[in-house]
Amino acid sequence: MGDIFHIPVLLEDVINLVETIYLDDGFVFVDCTLGEGGHSKAVLSKYQNINVIGIERDDVVLNRAKESLVEFSKRISYSNTWFDDFFCKYSLHRRFNFILADLGISMFHYKVGGRGFSFLEDEKLDMRLFPSDGGISAYDIVNTFDKEMLENLIYELGGEYYSRRIVKAILEYRKINKIQTSRELQRIICKAYPNVKFKINPATKTFQALRIYVNDELDRLKRSLPLWIANLSKNGILAIITFHSLEDKIVKEFFKGLTKDQYCILTKKPITSSFKEKQYNNASRSAKLRAVKKLYE
């Protein structure tokens, strides 16, 4: 398990943004999605006087990050909570120089998390980032939601053109058996798809839709955006890395709605990964980085 590490995406671009506003004293960088600490480690290594707050809800992943960042223990503090809860409860009277939110799922969850995020492994169908929080699981959804609910979920959150065919196959299957595992669901989806070649696995969009719904990803992002902006210091930067069009649209529209004399959008078009990065970090293919600077106190 120890050798599975998440490679941070668009790392050089994040560092370049930090460089534009870095102050040698009292600079605070908030990593809203610490994961295994890749972005934070790079920032702490490059800037000797920077302090980091790392937010990570998954305590297993957080412990892995702490191991990776042990040499920086005097300059980093941790919060084991969701990022929207952190800003609601703990930072009402603080201002931060840089806030980063990388909305991708850690490689740990895909490779060894055991929660059914990946159809490449035969795991229990769960997809909750933190199961002890309770809430609905992917297993609950595929085995209890009715036809209309499933079709809407898969189409709207996954952009899946064949949502009706997939749902029909799911409903037929569960007449006989419960859908227990990620590989089981993947097989059902693949059989429902037309017999032609596609660039991505037929199950990709459905799995995305389930993960988004289970973890309340879009509403959590919507709740967080005004909190992040409110907690920036003057000349502070908010940088957000998204991985699908639904997230990117939310961020884009929020930035567009900000008052122009109080905020400066730093990315007229989103920053995407270079050809070189795509070669060594496949996860970066769909990553988009948008950033905005706050111009007032």
Curated annotation (Swiss-Prot):
InterPro entries named in the record: RsmH (IPR002903), SAM-dep_MeTrfase_MraW_recog (IPR023397), SAM-dependent_MTases_sf (IPR029063)
Pfam families assigned: Methyltransf_5
Protein name per the record: Ribosomal RNA small subunit methyltransferase H
Gene Ontology CC, one term: cytoplasm
Keywords annotated in UniProt: Cytoplasm, Methyltransferase, rRNA processing, S-adenosyl-L-methionine, Transferase
GO biological process, alphabetically ordered: rRNA base methylation
GO molecular function, one term: rRNA (cytosine-N4-)-methyltransferase activity
Reactions the enzyme catalyzes: cytidine(1402) in 16S rRNA + S-adenosyl-L-methionine = N(4)-methylcytidine(1402) in 16S rRNA + S-adenosyl-L-homocysteine + H(+)
SUPFAM superfamilies: Putative methyltransferase TM0872, insert domain, S-adenosyl-L-methionine-dependent methyltransferases
EC numbers for this chain: 2.1.1.199
Lineage: Bacteria, Pseudomonadati, Spirochaetota, Spirochaetia, Spirochaetales
Positions of S-adenosyl-L-methionine binding: 37-39, 56, 87, 102, 109
Localization of this protein: Cytoplasm
Entry annotated with the keyword Cytoplasm: yes
Superkingdom as given in the UniProt entry: Bacteria
Main location group: cytoplasm
Family to which the UniProt record says this protein belongs: Belongs to the methyltransferase superfamily. RsmH family.
Organism field: Borrelia duttonii (strain Ly)
Function: Specifically methylates the N4 position of cytidine in position 1402 (C1402) of 16S rRNA.
